[in-house]
Amino acid sequence: MKHIHLLLLAFLALFAGAPFRAAAEESFRDKVVLIPVGEDALTSKQSFGFMNRILERAQKEQARAVVFEMNTPGGLAWETSEMMMKSIQPLTIPTYAYVNPKAMSAGALISAACDKIYMAPVSSIGAAGIITSSG
């Protein structure tokens, strides 16, 4: 398990030297763009708007790759499916999901839309179902 974690870190170092935070204003050209998907990231339309703009910019500026660092219990189903189909799938640059420690529900769907999924030891992914407001 430890080897997988080290392999991912080596992979990121090889392609980017150091992870590049998506919020910075310098060019994404030839950089790995890291998009943290935290606990609340998939529960607001503003977060989806931000991630969609970052993905568009990464494509336009020819980033080397996009890595979604997943730590989410899930979120909005419609916005997630829109992001998968309209923002992630059309990308011509590689996309990776790094699950650390969880990608549940909408997080699992975003991970599935990526080219490859890497998981930290003792991480979990799954339970991608629609839950209504009544439970």
PLM features: what roles do these ranges have?
Residues 1-5:
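Positively charged n-region of N-terminal signal peptides that target proteins for export
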Residues 7-17:
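Bacterial N-terminal signal peptides
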Residues 20-135:
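Soluble extramembrane regions of membrane proteins in the secretory/endomembrane system
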